[in-house]
Amino acid sequence: MNKIIRFLFRYYRAKKLGFKFRGISSFKIPTKLSLNGKIIKLSFPEEKGVFIDFVSIFLDDDYNLARIKTKKILTIVDIGANVGFFSIAARLAFPNAKIFSYEPNNQLEGYLQDNFLELNIELQMNAVGRDSGRIQLHNCGDSNQSRVVSNKEGPIEMCS
């Protein structure tokens, strides 16, 4: 995508969400968003991966949520929610949908609870996989890079 077009797209999306965007080099994730006329506070760890997720989900709309014309989507499942940015963007795009958010990393629970406070998103602090059982989380740097490892005595439940 042309740099000017990408800048204008990001600028427009930021304005619609209630914050300013003047360029990626000086950009900081905002602590508040305007969602359907409601101001919500954002809570997140200061990590490069979280920054990249915010830009790709909210500014670049990598999931094309703004382009889906039907509002008849009734259920959305966010598996591996991290701090919940996709679920928040889905709430913006589909205000009446039932949203289920799954995240196995207990270190992110506080961020998720804060971010979902007034958004009617159902949070489950467990993993989702092919088979139900127990797992262990393997942290690989930033929180969005964590991986699950099957472990019958692991501390985290995985549902299928």
In which residue ranges do the predicted regions lie?
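Phosphate/nucleotide-binding beta-alpha loop and adjacent structural elements of enzyme active sites
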Residues: 1-160
